[in-house]
Amino acid sequence: MIEEVVVEGQVYQLVENYKSGFDKKVFTERYSDILAKYDFIVGDWGYDQLRLKGFFDDQNPKATFDTKVAAIDDYLLEYCNFGCAYFIVKRIVK
């Protein structure tokens, strides 16, 4: 079964969970309403802290080069600790 989480009325579906980085409780605690505008959220762990970063679908008119979902791999390589646990959730519009 695909894991979903509801935060502040937004439904998110877990699409990647590298090294078991997804923790529903911590994600819910760290979530900020500013993230609701993004189509995807990446959560990465460093120094026992969860950092969240939003990305838009590549076709979203709000997307810039650095905020497109296609840039997630670059983000993980450049801004995250090497080999860190991370996850990606996708906003589901119902």
Regions picked out by a protein language model, each given a short descriptive name:
Residues 13, 41-42, 51-53, 85-90:
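Ordered hydrophobic segments in well-structured contexts
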Residues 36, 43-60:
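N-terminal interaction modules that seed assembly of large macromolecular complexes
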Residues 1-46:
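N-terminal leader/targeting segments and the first structural element of proteins
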Residues 64-94:
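Helix-rich interaction surfaces within compact, conserved domain-sized segments
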Residues 30-31, 35, 40, 60, ...:
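Acidic, Ser/Thr- and Gly-enriched intrinsically disordered low-complexity segments
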